[in-house]
C-alpha cells in the first residue's frame, strides 16, 4: 500500500456544531495524520474557484453560499491509501444514505450541509491541496 495525501474540508455546518475535534479524531483513529490544517472564512471568489467544475450545475450558487456561510477547516491528511480511507470515513454524500458510524451519518444535516469534503482522486487531491496550501505549509510526520 502506498502512503498518499488527500484534502479534507470540515464544512460550515460541522464547524458551527463544534464537532471539529470529533471529526479529526475519526481521521486519526483510522491511521490518517493531519499534516496541514487551518481554519478560514472562504470568500465568494475562493469558493467559486474551488468548486469551478460545478459552475454550470443548478446547485452551484447554493453551494457557494453555503461554503461561505461560516468558517471551514481545510486540511491535508496523510496515510496508507488516504484518499479511499477518507472517503470511507466520510460516508455517502447524502447522509441519509451514509452507513452508520460514518462522519456524514453522525454529523451531517442534509445532502447540502453534509459536514465534510474529501478528494475523490489523486489528481483532485493534488489540485485541492495546492489551492489552499503552499508546499511549505504541508509538513510530513
Swiss-Prot record:
Pfam families: NDK. Keywords: ATP-binding, Cytoplasm, Kinase, Magnesium, Metal-binding, Nucleotide metabolism, Nucleotide-binding, Phosphoprotein, Transferase. ATP binds at residues 11, 59, 87, 93, 104, 114. GO terms for biological process: CTP biosynthetic process; GTP biosynthetic process; UTP biosynthetic process. It is found in: Cytoplasm. Homotetramer. This is Nucleoside diphosphate kinase.
Amino acid at each position: 500500500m502506498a502512503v498518499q495525501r488527500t484534502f479534507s474540508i470540515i464544512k460550515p455546518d460541522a464547524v458551527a456544531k463544534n464537532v471539529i475535534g470529533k471529526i479529526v479524531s475519526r481521521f486519526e483513529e483510522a491511521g490518517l495524520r493531519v499534516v496541514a490544517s487551518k481554519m478560514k472564512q472562504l470568500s465568494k471568489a475562493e469558493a467559486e474557484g474551488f468548486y469551478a467544475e460545478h459552475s454550470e450545475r443548478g446547485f452551484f450558487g447554493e453551494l457557494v453560499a453555503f461554503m461561505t456561510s461560516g468558517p471551514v477547516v481545510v486540511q491535508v491528511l496523510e496515510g496508507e491509501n488516504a484518499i479511499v480511507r477518507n472517503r470511507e470515513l466520510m460516508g455517502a454524500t447524502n447522509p441519509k444514505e451514509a452507513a452508520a458510524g460514518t462522519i456524514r451519518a453522525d454529523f451531517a444535516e442534509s445532502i447540502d450541509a453534509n459536514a465534510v469534503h474529501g478528494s475523490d482522486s489523486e489528481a483532485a487531491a493534488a489540485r485541492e491541496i495546492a489551492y489552499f496550501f503552499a508546499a511549505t505549509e504541508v509538513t510530513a510526520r
